[in-house]
Amino acid sequence: NKSKKRRNRVSFLGVATIEPPKPIPLTWKTEKLVWVNQWPLPKQKLEALHLLANEQLEKGHIEPSFSPWNSPVFVIQKKSGKWRMLTDLRAVNAVIQPMGPLQPGLPSPAMIPKDWPLIIIDLKDCFFTIPLAEQDCEKFAFTIPAINNKEPATRFQWKVLPQGMLNSPTICQTFVGRALQPVRKKFSDCYIIHYIDDILCAAETKDKLIDCYTFLQAEVASAGLAIASDKIQTSTPFHYLGMQIENRKIKPQKIEIRKDTLKTLNDFQKLLGDINWIQPTLGIPTYAMSNLFSILRGDSDLNSKRILTPEATKEIKLVEEKIQSAQINRIDPLAPLQLLIFATAHSPTGIIIQNTDLVEWSFLPHSTVKTFTLYLDQIATLIGQTRLRIIKLCGNDPDKIVVPLTKEQVRQAFINSGAWQIGLANFVGIIDNHYPKTKIFQFLKLTTWILPKITRREPLENALTVFTDGSSNGKAAYTGPKERVIKTPYQSAQRAELVAVITVLQDFDQPINIISDSAYVVQATRVVETALIKYSMDDQLNQLFNLLQQTVRKRNFPFYITHIRAHTNLPGPLTKANEQADLLVSSALIKAQELHALTHVNAAGLKNKFDVTWKQAKDIVQHCTQCQVLHLPTQEAGVNPRGLCPNALWQMDVTHVPSFGRLSYVHVTVDTYSHFIWATCQTGESTSHVKKHLLSCFAVMGVPEKIKTDNGPGYCSKAFQKFLSQWKISHTTGIPYNSQGQAIVERTNRTLKTQLVKQKEGGDSKECTTPQMQLNLALYTLNFLNIYRNQTTTSAEQHLTGKKNSPHEGKLIWWKDNKNKTWEIGKVITWGRGFACVSPGENQLPVWIPTRHLKFYNEPIRDAKKSTSAETETPQSSTVDSQDEQNGDVRRTDEVAIHQEGRAADLGTTKEADAVSYKISREHKGDTNPREYAACSLDDCINGGKSPYACRSSCS
């Protein structure tokens, strides 16, 4: 074909003519036309634009156009007075698919072998010598307007790579790279660097360099590219990519930083970007530019104002001095590279050397991702980063890495530091700690805080133990050999805790063990000694962390710090001591509650000691189960324990109401004291749904002391336990797969469903259309209207007032102890359906008893001493037990007796109740039955109410 013939055509000189590379087509995100109107231009600029357009037209770079695309065009005047034409291609670039960078970074001139001769060339108008694909030309059309629209506008489109097009640099690199491929292949022993349109050639001898350059000229010309003859460099000093290259040394080109133009964030961002570009050559440590970096903080608007501080001005001056004096060295290609790590302030500094010649500096970024980064981890990160840089520069790992650690410290780092293991992964070279003897590194400001000296990983023996705590009310405290409370301005418990730890480190100039209930503070204190602290926009937090670090580093004695979980109710001295520290920082109300829990002081005493109101003091007493009754009851067989006051014990469960649709999961909570019910309908029964339900309960019922649930996953999750811990609520579960432990809430579920059915089938509440509205109406009825058996008030009244209404409360009874098989005397604390809570006497825990194991004492209530002493008169129940086994009617008679007693008592006539009780007692067989020992209580007893044995013939 024709193209093949052209490729094989031979000129009269005998040199093959190579066809220029084909244009690279662009990929477009959309076929939608892009038209941006041309803005008016002043007459002077319009005339300059016409001249430039005609010039480009003559050179064949543009052509007339009728394209439906348009981009604005404008001109700018250079310092020389010449005009330059530019096209605003932002709208077009937005619909071009990016090609991606081919050279992500500048090549380092330090890799050019030393003493090799060089030639540096610059391609002339490189973009304008590379054609656009024919189908893409119309996308880069522009319009030159006419003044007053007195004539049609002139339209052109680019035929070559336009300045400002998104992919122009990539296409240019590709074209030039293709042109240089034959040169690289033929002169593989030469060192050739190509970046955009700048080309550097180095060879071991001058003759070989000339041969290489001659061949390069021909290849570049055959590709349609032109060399700028006025920019060819053949002698030292060479200038390439901002560097001045000599036979062995490389220096940055002399520049002066204009400080008068530094006014906005964008100005400082550009300045630091330029400094960062030459930092590997300048060798300015990161810590030496901290004030310049701090100017970047704040408003992220590029046009936001910034002020050059005196400290930052000094750092700019340092940069200028380094530009004048800094230098690096070209390498010997036959000698290996080494990496030196110096423990400089703020963060470590890396130096790539060859023998004693400096090749490049390496630094970590000024800002870090973590709040605290250990210095050892920084060293490991810098090693990994610089190893990759060396491999990128020369293709090999460094021959040796020198670190500021002993052999034992290096061994421990491999064992304990994950960052160290990653940074040195697959390294087979030498790890040493002997630095070369040279003066070029002596200016570095070194630090000794590489590994911890004061902070210990294990508890200290024979050291003081101090507990710390902080509260959101701003108080910090510690307790131990002595106690101290510190008032802080912080409204964060963690920050107050941080102040407490700092104070302990300052107050105890001796070895100490610190125990804190803040995991965050503990972790920060453990690592702060050698850590780089990340800057935070919160100035208070910065000050606290810096003060903590300074305090730790100033200490002369070691310390150990560990974490303890708060409010766990675990036994042991650590928990008690931590609670004592908590008490020191609690608010007045919390202190009053904790003091009452400790001493059970009355409301007047609480108000006198703490700054609380009468209502708050009374609420504390009313919510205390010990102060409302004698003691907290213990669980006995066959009984569901109830709360003895509102919010003492809740039961909670999830039931299902299919008619509610996706809200069919109804979460139900019942207060076991008042039987107050609250329920919410939700879409599931996970922990998040349970927490949402409980927050609703808290808003209506208050916060309970204890909650009992089944063993569902929503109730047994760690997230739920954490939620309860935050609210200081204890939690118990029933026996798996046994619903009897949840009998109260199970019965409540049935009651609630029944009420819902009643409302739906026979109610007139047509307004209750949503599931929650139906549920709320049922709850209002059950809580505020219904009065249940053995109650005289509604559940809502009982829950809000805490008032007991059982008619049997305070009465003396006989109760059966199933463990000892004996009948004992007790006093009724509360009485419900099928259960009662009984106090056996002073200093004894109350017990929950089924009503079938209760029998009325039937005598005027005596004082506690006499009631307790009566136990000596109580007969053993072995005969009763044997009768229970032999005669099934006895148990039935007991139950009938209790039922009749309750019924008689409900009538309100004590005489009749006593008479019924005595009559039933005579039906029991044997003299050892407790009924036979019940004293006669008839007003006309001829024996004075003594033993009923003497009354059988007279009083009965």
Curated annotation (Swiss-Prot):
What is the residue range of the motif YXDD? 195-198
- Locate the motif LPQG: 161-164
Instruction: Give the binding site residues for Zn(2+).
Output: H596, H600, C624, C627
- Output one GO BP term: DNA recombination
The entry's keywords: DNA integration, DNA recombination, DNA-binding, Endonuclease, ERV, Hydrolase, Metal-binding, Multifunctional enzyme, Nuclease, Nucleotidyltransferase, RNA-directed DNA polymerase, Transferase, Transposable element, Zinc, Zinc-finger
- Reverse transcriptase domain span: 57-245
Whereabouts does the entry annotate DNA binding, in residue ranges?
Answer: 811-859
Q: Where does Mg(2+) 2 bind?
A: D469, D582
Residues annotated as domain RNase H type-1: 460-590
Q: Where does Mg(2+) 1 bind?
A: D469, E497, D517
Keyword DNA-binding: yes or no? yes
MF annotations from Gene Ontology? DNA binding; RNA stem-loop binding; RNA-directed DNA polymerase activity; RNA-DNA hybrid ribonuclease activity; zinc ion binding
Cite the EC number: 2.7.7.49, 3.1.26.4
The record's listing under InterPro entries reads: DNA/RNA_pol_sf, Integrase-like_N, Integrase_C_dom_sf_retrovir, Integrase_C_retrovir, Integrase_cat-core, Integrase_Zn-bd_dom_N, Rev_trsase/Diguanyl_cyclase, RNaseH-like_sf
Residue ranges annotated as compositionally biased, kind Polar residues, are: 869-881
What is the documented function of this protein?
Answer: Early post-infection, the reverse transcriptase converts the viral RNA genome into double-stranded viral DNA. The RNase H domain of the reverse transcriptase performs two functions. It degrades the RNA template and specifically removes the RNA primer from the RNA/DNA hybrid. Following nuclear import, the integrase catalyzes the insertion of the linear, double-stranded viral DNA into the host cell chromosome. Endogenous Pol proteins may have kept, lost or modified their original function during evolution.
The family this protein is said to belong to = Belongs to the beta type-B retroviral polymerase family. HERV class-II K(HML-2) pol subfamily.
What is the official name of this protein in its record? Endogenous retrovirus group K member 8 Pol protein
- Name the source organism: Homo sapiens (Human)
